[in-house]
């Protein structure tokens, strides 16, 4: 004898299949979503670059104007001591320079662009410091973190030496990156926290006038 399902059991079975089917997502959809999510995450990975351009208040402010730069922090690098703070660096006890660490989106701005931008916001002819600030801690330097950055920096420097709009020699060195020590909170975004004092200092130091004298409209 052939057994048949009762109407109630049949209805329950159909309902159960419907619930299961409604919660099934095709594998292709999951894969596509995962690939899209991975692509978005890869675009958001930031790179970092380190530059010393005299007073870190100023070079921090300059780099934060550049599209693709997500964050700039002030700090100290290039020295021999295993620690650094404003007092010891200013009194030249550690060999460090005032510097900035730039976090940037390479899909928006390239390392080569950062290097070119750096050159045009410093005085690369000054071997005593930068602008009104003199002393070892205010010397300029470009720090590379890997072979690719080194090649880009060397290529940029070579081109600059051929095309520079001034006669003086370029003395800013290209150096392998060392440990970067974050500066005190007081110095971070100083130009935003103390705009009047910062503006007075920057104008008084002659930074913008000297940059304009060297580079004209090449910024």
Predicted regions and their residues:
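Flexible coil/turn and secondary-structure edge motifs
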Residues: 2-6, 11, 16-219
């Amino acid at each position: 004898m052939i057994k048949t399902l009762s109407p109630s059991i049949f209805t329950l079975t159909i309902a159960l299949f419907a619930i299961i089917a409604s919660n099934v997502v095709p594998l292709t959809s999951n894969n596509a979503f995962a690939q899209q999510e991975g692509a978005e995450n890869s675009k958001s990975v930031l790179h970092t670059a380190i530059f010393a351009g005299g007073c870190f208040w100023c070079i921090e402010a300059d780099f934060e104007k550049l599209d693709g730069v997500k964050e700039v922090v002030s700090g100290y690098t290039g020295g021999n001591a295993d620690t650094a703070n404003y007092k010891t660096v200013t009194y030249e006890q550690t060999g460090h320079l005032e510097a900035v660490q730039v976090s940037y989106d390479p899909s928006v701005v390239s390392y080569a662009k950062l290097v070119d931008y750096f050159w045009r916001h410093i005085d690369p002819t000054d071997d005593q410091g930068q602008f009104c600030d003199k002393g070892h801690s205010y010397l300029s330097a470009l720090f590379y973190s890997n072979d690719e950055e080194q090649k880009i920096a060397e290529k940029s420097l070579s081109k600059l030496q051929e095309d520079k709009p001034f006669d003086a020699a370029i003395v800013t060195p290209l150096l392998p990156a060392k440990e970067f020590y974050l500066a005190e909170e007081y110095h971070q975004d100083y130009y935003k926290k103390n705009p009047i004092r910062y503006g007075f200092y920057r104008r008084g130091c002659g930074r913008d006038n000297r940059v304009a004298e060297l580079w004209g409209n090449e910024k």
